[in-house]
Amino acid sequence: MTVENVEEKLSINEHLKTDSDFLRGGIEEGLDTAVTGAFSEGDQQLIKFHGFYQQDDRDLRNERKEQKLEPLYSFMLRARVAGGVCTPEQWLGVDEISSTLTSSNSIRLTTRQTFQYHGISKRNLRTLIQSLDKKALDSIAACGDVNRNVMCNPNPVESRLHEQAYYWAKKLSDIYLPRTKAYAEIWLGDDKVATSEGDEVEPIYGKTYLPRKFKMAVAVPPDNDVDVYTNDLGLIAVAQEGELVGFNLVAGGGMGSTHGEVETFPRLADDFGFIKAEDTLKFAEAILKVQRDWGNRSNRKQSRLKYTIVKHGYDAFKAEVEKRAGVTFEPKRDVVIGDRGDRYGWIKGVDNRWHLTLFIEGGRIKDLPGQPLQTGLREIAKIHKGDFRMTSNQNFIVAGVAEEDKEAIEALARNHGLMGKLITETRGRSIACVALPTCALAMAEAERYFPDFLTKVESLQEKHGFADQGIVIRMTGCPNGCARPFAAEIGLVGKAPGRYNLYLGASFEGTRLNKLYRENIQEAEILSELDQLFARYVSEREEGETFGNFTVRSGVVKAVIDAAKDFHD
C-alpha cells in the first residue's frame, strides 16, 4: 500500500476541518446562542484552533444533574507566548483579565511556557480575547492540529546565546501560525474576507491542517528545562565562542498514550543530525510538510509524528525530509544534555543583569492565605524595567534586573510569599497537570493533590538520608501526558479516582523514558513501594548515580530503548 492511499477512511475531525471554511465553522453562531453555555460538538473541536477548550466543573456535575441543569460549562483559554517571554505591561493586562473575566481568579502557568485561564463563560470569550489583543497577545494556535506554542530555554544567563535561541523560537512560532482570518473575524471584529483554495489561504497547512498537534522546542545546553526530546521537533543549540552556529535536530517525541491500548505509547525524539542555523526553516518546514502528507488522518490516536516515523521508518523519513529541505543533515555535534530544573533565586547573567526565578507551586498564580502571589507579581510588574519569562517547569522569572533595582524587587517578592520558603530539590523539579475538576480527560487528581503527595515523598527522602538530592517526579490525571510524566524518574499517571500507575526508570536528564512498575495503586501502596526502593537506592547506589538510573541498573525496571517495541513489554 502506498503512502498516498494508506488512509481509507478519514476521521471525523478531518471532515470537520475540511468543512469548517478555514476554522470558522459555526463558532460565531454558537457565541450568539444564549440558551446554552456550550458550543456544538463539532465546534468544540474547532475552537481549539482558536486557543480554548470547553470544560465543565466536574465537582458540580452530579449536583447539577439532580437539579436538571446542564453542566456548569466554562472555557479554558491558553495564550500563545513563544519562549514564555512577556513584558511587565503585558503581564498587568493578563492579571487584570484573570480577576475580571474568569471565575477562577487565577492564572495558570503551563508546562509549555505560557499561561492559561480557567472558568471563562461563553459570553466573556470575545471580550477576553479582545483584551489580550490590546496587549499584543493572542491565543491562536495555542491548541489544535497545528504548530503550538514554541518553547525556548528561559534562563537568560548566557544572554547572547539565549537571545539567538529565542529569535528562532519566535520565528518558528510566527511563521507556522495558521494564515486563516477566522480568528480576527470572529474575535476581533475584522471584516470577513472571501476564502479561496486551501493552498492560497494556508500555504503550509492546507485546508485540513496537520493530522494532529505539533510541538517544537529550542534547548540551550547543558540545560534541558524544555524537555527537548519530548517534542515533535527539537532544536538543540550548538555554539562556538558563545555564538549560535546551528542545531542538533531531533524529531518524533511525544508523551500521549491511552491506557490499555498497546499500539499507543510515549516516545522520545530521534537524533537526526546537525543543521546550520541558516537552514533551520528549510528543515522545520520539510518536517511539518512530511507530517502533513504522511501522518495518519484516519486514527487520531496514531496521528502524531512519532507514529509517522515508526510506521515509515527512520531512514525513509530522514531521506524525505532531506529531499524536501534540499539540504542534508551533518553528523550531530557533541553537546552535553544536563539538568531539567530551574535555577531558583538570583542569578547574574554575563551582561551583569540579574534574573530572579520564583517557584510557583503547580504553576497556579493566585492570592492564597499568607501568600498573595498574584498581588506580588502585580506589584513587581508595576516597577520592573526588564521582562518576564515563564518556564516549562511552571515557574516565573523576573529577568533583566539592574543591580540598583534588586532590593526593591526582592522586597516585594518576600513580602508576598514569592520568596523565603524552603523548596527541596525534588519539589523544585516536579510538575503536575491541572486535572480535576476542570479537565474533561482527567481520571484522577493531579494539581490539587500533588503538593501534599510530594510532602510525603520528601519525608521518605529525609528518612533515608538523601533529602538534599533531587528526583524528577511528575503527576498527571490521565495518560495524555501534559506534564510529561513518562519522562520523569517517578511518573504517576491517573487511572481512576485515587489510583495511579507508577512508572520508574527515566533518566534525570530526560534522555530515556520510564516504564510501568505498578498499576492502578493507591497512595499507601505508592509510598510503600517508594519507601522500599529508597532504602535499596541508598544502600546499593553507585557514586553519583541518580534514582532513575539506579532503578534500571538494579533491574527494578527494564530500560526503554525503543518505545514502540519495549515500552509495554
From Swiss-Prot:
Biochemical pathway: Sulfur metabolism; hydrogen sulfide biosynthesis; hydrogen sulfide from sulfite (NADPH route): step 1/1
The keyword Iron-sulfur is annotated on this UniProt entry: yes
Keywords: 4Fe-4S, Amino-acid biosynthesis, Cysteine biosynthesis, Heme, Iron, Iron-sulfur, Metal-binding, NADP, Oxidoreductase
InterPro entries, A to Z: CysI, NiRdtase/SiRdtase_haem-b_fer, Nit/Sulf_reduc_fer-like_dom_sf, NO2/SO3_Rdtase_4Fe4S_dom, NO2/SO3_Rdtase_4Fe4S_prot, NO2/SO3_Rdtase_4Fe4S_sf, NO2/SO3_Rdtase_FeS/sirohaem_BS
Top class in the EC scheme: oxidoreductase
TM spans (from-to): none
Cofactor names: siroheme; [4Fe-4S] cluster
The organism's place on the tree of life at top rank: Bacteria
GO cellular component: sulfite reductase complex (NADPH)
Keyword NADP: yes
GO MF term list: 4 iron, 4 sulfur cluster binding; heme binding; metal ion binding; NADP binding; sulfite reductase (ferredoxin) activity; sulfite reductase (NADPH) activity
Residues binding [4Fe-4S] cluster, per UniProt: C433, C439, C478, C482
Family: Belongs to the nitrite and sulfite reductase 4Fe-4S domain family.
Protein name: Sulfite reductase [NADPH] hemoprotein beta-component
Annotated source species: Shewanella sediminis (strain HAW-EB3)
Gene: cysI
